[in-house]
Amino acid sequence: NLLNKFSDAILNTQWKSIGWFFCLWCLILLICLLGYFWAFWRIYSGIEMLSIWEFIYNPFASVVGLFLISVFLPVPDKHTESAVMSEHFMAKCKPFYVTLALLWLQFGIAPMFVGFEQSPLEVAFAWLMIVVSTSGIFLKSFEGHKFVLVAFASCYLGQEVIQLAISS
């Protein structure tokens, strides 16, 4: 679904004016998806047995959340005029940001249920991602949404760089 949104963003938007915004959201969410599956092995590698409730709350809820984010990401279709693409995003972005914030909250809490300890920097970045995601709910200007996108991408990529440095 996210790949379909990405291809729609590439095909249906003008890159210079607004297309980069939708494409960057799709790209950073694809990177988050890959990051989740990469982290999954790190978190669950030592687990021999999960109860059904641990499975539902941890990996299953994460995958459902990632899917819902891809559904709620308001990428315009080919029938949306380029002049109203920003209004299209602003009118439909609240479910996307709520789901994104809830997913990061779940990502921050879930490792504790299986006894996985995160570094203080990982925890701090997880809370920062929640704040950045939640702030998108309250914005009234498209410029603010651009800032949230850049802040979200910077925080996520910064978190990944720090995790890479810690593991090296």
Show which residues each predicted segment covers.
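Membrane-interface helix-boundary motifs at transmembrane edges
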Residues: D8-F21, S45-L50, K78-M90, F138-V148
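A generic, lipid-embedded transmembrane alpha helix
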Residues: W20-I43
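Membrane-helix interface and helix-disruption motif detector
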Residues: Y44-E54, A110-V123, F142, I166-S168
